[in-house]
Amino acid sequence: MSVGILGAGAFGTALAISLGHTTPVTLWARDAKQAQVMQNTRENTARLPGFALPAGVKVTSNLADLQGCDVLLLAVPAQKLRQFLRGLDQMVAGKTLVTCCKGIELETGMGPVDIAREICPQSEHAILTGPSFANDIAKGLPTALTLACANPDRARQLQQELSNGTLRLYRTSDVIGAQLGGALKNVIAIACGAAIGAQLGESARAALMTRGNAEMQRYAQHKGADASTLSGLSGFGDLVLTCTSELSRNYRFGLALGAGKAFDPATTVEGAATACAVAQEAREKALDMPISSVVAALVENRLDVENAMTKLLSRSLKEE
């Protein structure tokens, strides 16, 4: 099996490094100059410095070079996925598209697999998600992820081909649950970061993580997912990692919000758009999504952290 990776950011590059030791990998970068530099220097100094690309990785900016790949990993931001895939449906027909981004599209409320399936109906679809940082994968540190695919035979094949000595994949057919877990945990991570940034303490973070997990499961069930999927790697596992580490962009964004500091606008923060998409649906369909709604208000500058916590703590008392 040959693998193509669309997106030469930190995560796409890390996957190329991990898989490239045993599998032929073609890594596509949008910028031709960046692709040439990476191909020549064997390093992504802009996005993932300090890690050498294996000999089995070819870097290109020419989409035609991916024609021979059986599997394409889509490592592009969720909010840009639709625009990116437009016009590629014929090129990717018959191939397996594995989305590797985590988010909910603001305009439509759709997840990454839903978007890819709509734009590229002649392809097989899956999602790779779970608790992982690009640096850990590139270093070859033990990492476990969820591979979700509705086709059980294809899921088994992908699991075998993409797993290696340091990257272990667990498969599921619950695509909805897997993509929602990865998206929603980013929202909770912003909330936790804001609490710590505002010096509200570790107890507040623990409460937000626990009630956030319940909120994630509630929303996933509303969308037709199996709630138990949110207790696995793609849900709870990713939640724990993202809410406790400053390597998480969403958590760092929350820290900045809580501390009243500026955050680099060039940094992708998937949880911000996801929070707004979820909050909008919660309003329209009377869903109980208090943390997501508060995060959306924080992101849109309609609420500060102190009032956000007051709003959460003043809700009607209830059974757990």
Swiss-Prot record:
InterPro entries: 6-PGluconate_DH-like_C_sf, 6PGD_dom2, G3P_DH_NAD-dep, G3P_DH_NAD-dep_C, G3P_DH_NAD-dep_N, NAD(P)-bd_dom_sf
Primary localization class, coarse: cytoplasm
Biological pathway: Membrane lipid metabolism; glycerophospholipid metabolism
Protein residues bound to sn-glycerol 3-phosphate: 102, 130, 132, 185, 238, 248-250
Catalytic residues in the record: 185 (proton acceptor)
Keyword check for Zinc-finger: no
GO cellular component: cytosol
One BP annotation, GO: phospholipid biosynthetic process
Reaction catalysed by this enzyme: sn-glycerol 3-phosphate + NAD(+) = dihydroxyacetone phosphate + NADH + H(+); sn-glycerol 3-phosphate + NADP(+) = dihydroxyacetone phosphate + NADPH + H(+)
Subcellular location: Cytoplasm
Top class in the EC scheme: oxidoreductase
Binding site for NADPH: 11, 30, 102, 134, 249, 270
GO MF assignments: glycerol-3-phosphate dehydrogenase [NAD(P)+] activity; NAD binding
Family membership: Belongs to the NAD-dependent glycerol-3-phosphate dehydrogenase family.
This protein's name: Glycerol-3-phosphate dehydrogenase [NAD(P)+]
Organism listed in the record: Roseobacter denitrificans (strain ATCC 33942 / OCh 114)
